[in-house]
Structures are given as structure tokens and as C-alpha cells.
A protein has these predicted regions:
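Conserved glycine-rich cofactor-binding loop
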Residues: 18-20
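The beta1-alpha1 cofactor-binding region of Rossmann-like NAD(H)/NADP(H)-dependent oxidoreductases
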Residues: 60-71, 103
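Substrate-binding pocket helix/loop in short-chain dehydrogenase/reductase
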Residues: 96-98, 102-110
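Residue(s) in the substrate-gating loop at a strand-loop-helix junction
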Residues: 141
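Active-site-adjacent segment of SDR/Rossmann-fold oxidoreductases
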Residues: 146, 167-177
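C-terminal helical subdomain
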Residues: 174-177, 181-182, 201-243
Length: 245
């Protein structure tokens, strides 16, 4: 009787994986067959999401390099090849005119929305190369290319992240690393409330980007043939008025 081939174990990490877009991304990657680790600061939410979706939770702060090292030390101990990093963690911090933001507000906004993802990319890239190839998906924002008053620091962080992604891809293109910037707009997540923005009407929220929808897009990007990659994708809900595009 022929022996069954052992199933290839593909490892993935999703930051901010317990809520909002991260929850949808985690679910989609688990369904696609990945062994998924999720990180975040809310231990209860992490454990709840991990139990529900079949992922592994690690409490960690993306702004801490020590936490990043600890997370990858855990992942490295597990069998399989590390193929996917989704830098999803982010926050609005203090959405207000630049002169009304404190230096601490700006520092934190850049730490959460830019530096944290850079720390992750620096650690994930060599592991993905060693695995023979894979994908980093950075969840950016339409704010990287669309200007709105009050979003200056957040926009600067996301624009910087997108340019970093392009350079990182060029540095490792021949080694099989793909780096995608995925920039969604209005979403049915907790982002608005956390940023202390006006709450979306239920009808608008229903027609905004759903976590499961973004999750499917991320999984599809990761499933592309190895000779193809998505450099960047901008995702708008049609209910959102944008002029000019």
C-alpha cells in the first residue's frame, strides 16, 4: 500500500489578529490551510479568537522589538515553513489637525502604524526566503494616497509603509519574497471607535468593507502562483463618496 504524503505545514502570522480585519484575515488563512499565529495586546480577545478559529495566540505589542523576537522564537520552534506575514495591527491614535496632536501622539502613531510593521518585515523576510518564498501583506490605508484634514500623521505612516514595501520587494524579488500593500477604506471594524471618530450609521457599516471580505482578498493574494504578485491594491466600498479618486 502506497504511503500517504505528509501534509506540508505552512506557517503564517497575523498581527492584530483578534479583532476587525485581523479576525477576518485569520479565518481566511486558517481555512486556506495555514497554521496561523495571531498577536495583539488584548489577551482575552486573542484567546477567544484563537479558540474559535483554530489559531494560536501570543500576547505581544508590535511596537516592542523584544516582543517581535519572542513571537518569532515561538513560531520557529513549530514544524513547517514560515510563508506569510500579515501586518494588520494599526490605530488612529489621535485624529486631529497636526498642531493639535502632541509629540507623544505622533510618536505613538508612527510606532504602531509604521515602525511595528517594519520590525515585522525585517524578521519575516529572511524566514520567508529560507522557506523558498512567500508573501508579506501590509494592511495600509487609502490615507496613504488620499488627503483628509486631521489624518496627517496616520497618512504619513501608511505612505511610508507602502514605499518601504516596494523597496523590500526589490531587495528580495529574486529570492521569492512578495510584498503587497493592501489599502482599504471604510470598514466594519472597531477602528473608528478606537480613533474616537463619529460612529457609522448601521446602513453604512453594513455596506462597508467586511472583515471576511478583506480576509478572502488576503488569502487570494497569498495563493497566487509564485511567479505573480500584487504590488498594491486599493479597496473602496462604493457607498463612500470620494472626490477626486
Amino acid at each position: 500500500m502506497p504511503q500517504k504524503k505528509s501534509r506540508k505545514i505552512r506557517k503564517a502570522l497575523v498581527t492584530g489578529g483578534a479583532k476587525g480585519y485581523g479576525l477576518g484575515i485569520t479565518q481566511a488563512l486558517v481555512q486556506a490551510g495555514y497554521q496561523v499565529w495571531i498577536t495583539g495586546r488584548d489577551t482575552k480577545a486573542l484567546n477567544r479568537a484563537a479558540s474559535k478559529l483554530g489559531a494560536t495566540a501570543i500576547q505581544a505589542d508590535v511596537t516592542s522589538t523584544a516582543d517581535w523576537d519572542r513571537v518569532f522564537a515561538v513560531i520557529d520552534q513549530a514544524p513547517g515553513k514560515f510563508e506569510v506575514l500579515v501586518n494588520n495591527a494599526g490605530a488612529g491614535i489621535h485624529i486631529a489637525p497636526a498642531v493639535e496632536q502632541s509629540d507623544a501622539d505622533m510618536d505613538l502613531a508612527l510606532a504602531v502604524n509604521l515602525n511595528g510593521a517594519l520590525y515585522g518585515c525585517r524578521r519575516a523576510a529572511p524566514r520567508i526566503v529560507m522557506a523558498g518564498g512567500g508573501t508579506i501583506v501590509n494592511i495600509s490605508s487609502v490615507c496613504a494616497r488620499q488627503a483628509w484634514a486631521g489624518w496627517s500623521t496616520y497618512s504619513a505612516a501608511k505612505a511610508g509603509l507602502e514605499q518601504f514595501a516596494k523597496c523590500l520587494y526589490l531587495e528580495h524579488r529574486e529570492q521569492g519574497l512578495r510584498v503587497t500593500s493592501l489599502a482599504p477604506s471604510w470598514g466594519a471594524t472597531e477602528f473608528g471607535a478606537a480613533a474616537k471618530l463619529d460612529k457609522q450609521a448601521a446602513a453604512v457599516r453594513k455596506k462597508s468593507i467586511q472583515p471576511a471580505e478583506l480576509g478572502k482578498i488576503v488569502a487570494d493574494i497569498c495563493a497566487l502562483p509564485s511567479h505573480l504578485f500584487v504590488q498594491e491594491m486599493v479597496l473602496w466600498p462604493s457607498i463612500q463618496p470620494v472626490e477626486p479618486l
